[in-house]
Amino acid sequence: MNSVEFLPLDRITPNSVISTTSNDLSNWSRLSSLWPLLYGTSCCFIEFASLIGSRFDFDRYGLVPRSSPRQADLILTAGTVTMKMAPSLVRLYEQMPEPKYVIAMGACTITGGMFSTDSYSTVRGVDKLIPVDVYLPGCPPKPEAVIDAITKLRKKISWEIYEDRIQSQRKNRYFTIKHKFRVGRRIHTGNYNQGLLSKSPSISEIPPEKFFKYRSSVSSHEFVN
């Protein structure tokens, strides 16, 4: 009968056993295989499209662009989001499986950009619709900045606990696809009372309730969830 010979342990020989936890293994697998859903609506998406080329080669990060939200765990919102597009964006986000992440790319996505001052149809920040993990400012951001944002997201994934994230998302579900306009409370119109202005030389001495006059026929429209 042949005897079994055990080779002596050599320090040069690498260890074949790796000790880890299921949470760390899950985080490592998710950060190494992010599948983004491309949601480009403006010029910022052109900068992101350059990452697919050989110069930046974002495939080395395990990024595989998907066209279906049910196969993606990351959505990059690049460009202006309007009121009509808001329900579609929220619907795409809700169709993504858990855990899922969001990168807001560009000034128009984060704050509305140059359309935030006098546009009646622009959403002032995509975080009013869906929770955002990484904000990437710029007009537009460079491809190097996009890679840096993905790197920061990977670092965030490596430190998170899966159960805590699921509970936090269920608790903070402030987004919905039922975005409608409704008639809100009545407010003052801001019209000046010419009678008070002609009598008193000092405007600061007039109480606000007397300075403005109310009109019952005017009401405001509020964008609500």
UniProtKB/Swiss-Prot annotation:
Molecular function terms, GO-annotated: 4 iron, 4 sulfur cluster binding; iron ion binding; NADH dehydrogenase (ubiquinone) activity; quinone binding
Bilayer topology term: Peripheral membrane protein
Keyword Iron: yes
Protein location: Plastid, Chloroplast thylakoid membrane
Cofactor binding mode and count: Binds 1 [4Fe-4S] cluster.
GO cellular component: chloroplast thylakoid membrane; respiratory chain complex I
Keyword terms of this UniProt record: 4Fe-4S, Chloroplast, Iron, Iron-sulfur, Membrane, Metal-binding, NAD, NADP, Plastid, Plastoquinone, Quinone, Thylakoid, Translocase, Transport
InterPro entries per UniProt: NADH_UbQ_OxRdtase-like_20kDa (IPR006137), NADH_UQ_OxRdtase_20Kd_su (IPR006138)
SUPFAM superfamilies: HydA/Nqo6-like
Main subcellular localisation: plastid
Keyword Chloroplast: yes
Binding site for [4Fe-4S] cluster: 43-44, 108, 139
Enzyme Commission no: 7.1.1.-
GO biological process: aerobic respiration; electron transport coupled proton transport; photosynthesis, light reaction
UniProt catalytic activity: a plastoquinone + NADH + (n+1) H(+)(in) = a plastoquinol + NAD(+) + n H(+)(out); a plastoquinone + NADPH + (n+1) H(+)(in) = a plastoquinol + NADP(+) + n H(+)(out)
HAMAP family: NDH1_NuoB
Quaternary structure annotation from Swiss-Prot or TrEMBL: NDH is composed of at least 16 different subunits, 5 of which are encoded in the nucleus.
Family indicated by similarity: Belongs to the complex I 20 kDa subunit family.
Described purpose of this protein according to its UniProt entry: NDH shuttles electrons from NAD(P)H:plastoquinone, via FMN and iron-sulfur (Fe-S) centers, to quinones in the photosynthetic chain and possibly in a chloroplast respiratory chain. The immediate electron acceptor for the enzyme in this species is believed to be plastoquinone. Couples the redox reaction to proton translocation, and thus conserves the redox energy in a proton gradient.
Protein's recorded name: NAD(P)H-quinone oxidoreductase subunit K, chloroplastic
Organismal lineage: Eukaryota, Viridiplantae, Streptophyta, Embryophyta, Tracheophyta
